[in-house]
Amino acid sequence: MIPSTISLSAFRPEHLEGALRLSRQAGWPHRLEDWQMALDLSAGFVAMAANASTVLGTVLMTPYKRDVATINMVIVDEAARGRGLGRQLMKAVTTLAGSRALRLIATGEGLPLYQKLGFCRAGTIVQHQGQVLHVAPPTKARPAESRDIFGILELDRSAYGADRRDLLRTLAKVGQLAVLCNGQGLTGFAALRRFGRGEVIGPVVATNADDGKALLAYFMAEREGRFVRVDTAESSQLGAWLADRGLVRVDEGIAMQRPVVARSSCAPLTTFALASQAFG
């Protein structure tokens, strides 16, 4: 039960500064612009201190049409923990998500709560970042053109299992897209945008690891000495390749789903890097 001095309300733009305070307290790299993008694509709640109008907790739900949603930006102020705020925020946002299948990336600290709410482990997500070393430019990737967007949407839908057109159109506006072609059509794509301390590459979708590396290399080759982040599934086995190019492993999270949806072992496309831990 929420203490009488704290209330939940819809997450609105006027709460962004308070949310930024919480993410900085948690040691997250998000800028105000990163929070704004998350809110533009999402809906959610804040826990507010009734007397001081202080944001004490946040949660967002990013819907991908009516089938899937990610739960993200779950933060509770250090001074307000132990009161059940995390549980109340999660209950509110899962109700908001309705019948959608839910996905999230958990910290070890949040894992017990998510398990109690019916989420199950679905893998490990590894955060790589650092200053890019010299990377040779690939020969088979090119900048995306406006006519490529429909093919990109289909590639992502096949790899992710949901329609993320709003996210991808936003990435096309605020960042850059690159694609791979085989002469008959698109076979992979990657996105890059400003985020946190520098830039993030993702999503990266391809048919095999070599193509995934080529798409990553396309953006990394132009960014020697600059700070770049990549979030990838541990199962992608890109860790050593990224570390050799300056992006070292610094953290990891636990991918969780409710309900668990098994990925086909013969699926033609793989997501080699996430758009972010918030967006999947």
Per-region residue spans from a language model:
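Conserved active-site tyrosine of GNAT-family acetyltransferases
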Residues: 114-119, 242
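Active-site-proximal cofactor/substrate-binding loop regions of enzyme domains
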Residues: 5-99, 106
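Central beta-strand plus flanking loop segment that forms part of the substrate or channel wall
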Residues: 126-130, 256
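Conserved N-terminal entry element of GNAT/NAT acetyltransferase domains
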Residues: 1-13, 131-146
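Intrinsically disordered, low-complexity, positively biased terminal segments
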Residues: 2, 12-13, 17, 37, ...
